A protein has these predicted regions:
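Long, histidine/aromatic-enriched segments associated with O2/redox biology
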Residues: 1-203
């Protein structure tokens, strides 16, 4: 997805393993078992080890996944339904690896950071419309149906870091009922929403 300032790159691949556990050793063990079974017929492209940061915050300090659908209705947004019988119960997974310029981010005041995200940093309250810029992440990165109703996805983002390479980032993982929903979100972020606003978080 190529935009006027940034491009959301596409890395081809055939299989994605998303491994989560309370103990890192369990994640390693599962990944190792998978590798033992598939190493003769596959070529690994990338492996990212995320971690839980405090109370579910991204590495830039804001609570992540706030706008996920409630658990009792999550399947409605995240799982393919009767409209596609061949893939019913599956999900369209999007992954994006974002590297943050932490020096640039830390140079912003908390108030400036909040305007980038669209929420308060410490209590996770959404900014009021009279304060929140139209370029805020939680404004631009939304998808809507033909009637203008917001369509949600299930986010499972994780922060990651590699200090030796000065890499600090967010590994975006989104599960959606329809391919078009997450794509629309990314198009808004990188190419602009209906009003042409780009996601300032990408800066």
């Amino acid at each position: 997805i190529k935009g006027p300032k940034y491009t959301a790159v596409s890395t081809p691949g055939d299989v994605l393993f998303h491994i989560r556990a309370d103990k890192p050793a369990m994640c390693y063990e599962m990944a190792d078992l998978i590798n033992l079974q598939l190493k003769e017929i596959t070529q690994p492209i990338d492996a990212v080890q995320g971690f839980r940061y405090f109370d579910g915050r991204s590495i830039i300090g804001f609570v992540d996944g706030t706008e996920n659908p409630e658990p009792e209705i999550a399947a409605e947004y995240a799982l393919v339904g009767d409209e596609d019988p061949n893939f019913k119960g599956g999900s369209y997974a999007f992954i994006q690896k974002y590297i943050h310029d932490m020096d640039k981010w830390r140079a912003l005041s908390d108030e400036e950071q909040e305007k980038v995200i669209g929420r308060k940093k410490f209590n996770d309250v959404e900014l009021s419309d009279d304060v929140k810029p139209k370029t805020a992440h939680n404004v631009v990165s939304k998808a809507h149906d033909a009637d203008g109703n917001e369509i949600k996805i299930m986010r499972a983002n994780m922060p990651f870091s590699n200090p030796s390479k000065n890499e600090y980032g967010t590994f975006f993982i989104g599960y959606a009922r329809k391919f078009s929903v997450t794509r629309q979100m990314l198009e808004h972020m990188f190419q602009g929403d209906e009003e042409g606003n780009l996601d300032r978080l990408l800066d």
